[in-house]
Design a protein with these regions (language model features):
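Proteins with a high burden of low-complexity, intrinsically disordered sequence enriched in S/T/G/P/A and R
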Residues: 8-12, 53
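N-terminal Lys/Arg-rich, disordered targeting/topogenic segments
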Residues: 1-9
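Low-complexity, intrinsically disordered/propeptide-like segments
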Residues: 4, 15-19, 59
């Protein structure tokens, strides 16, 4: 009887770690499929130019379009980072992009360049990541009004986001940013 127990332990000692390793690798591969790093050269380039964390940019793209360059929202925002025509025109003027057309928002490099610049602009304008992300989602005018209202902000920082959609958006982007940071820690 003792002999059988001895044989089972070494087999279990080998199989159990292999099973755990297999499950961990399978989970990692699934997460990498769910949270890809597409357009990495472009993202890294514009992250460096704007000083933004590339994981934040990947998280915004994932949240906005799930990396679908042909995405169009019900509000007519277009491309990877979901930029609408009016915002696109504003950004193109600031970036001195001659001959900008609304259809250019479907070009990944153009959309990432514009979206990254705009997010950086909003974060600088409002002085924080939460406020910048909220403005990216709900618009700068709304964030200004929230900051001015003691129920939602202290004049500088948002303490409460009154739009559930925007509150969830900020939370989702932050969660995805953490996922990207963990999955691609070597990057």
């Amino acid at each position: 009887m003792k002999n059988r127990k001895r044989k089972k332990r070494p087999v279990l000692g080998i199989l159990l770690p292999l099973l755990i390793l297999t499950l961990a690798l399978t989970g990692y591969v699934l997460y990498v499929e769910l949270f890809p790093m597409r357009y990495s050269e472009t993202v890294e380039q514009y992250a460096a130019e704007t000083g933004l964390d590339s994981d934040l940019i990947y998280a915004v793209i994932h949240t906005e379009s799930k990396f679908r360059e042909d995405a169009v929202s019900p509000m007519d925002a277009k491309g990877l980072m979901q930029i609408n025509e009016i915002t696109g025109e504003f950004i193109s003027e600031k970036l001195e992009m001659a001959d900008f057309l609304d259809g250019d928002l479907f070009i990944p490099e153009t959309n990432i360049r514009m979206g990254t610049w705009y997010l950086s602009y909003l974060m600088e304008l409002f002085g924080g990541e939460t406020e910048g992300l909220a403005a990216y989602n709900a618009g700068p005018s709304r964030v200004r009004s929230w900051l001015a209202n003691p129920e939602y902000g202290d004049g500088t920082n948002l303490t409460n986001i009154p739009f559930k959609e925007t509150e969830n958006y900020v939370m989702r982007v932050r969660q995805r940013q953490k996922i990207y940071r963990v999955l691609y820690f070597w990057n």
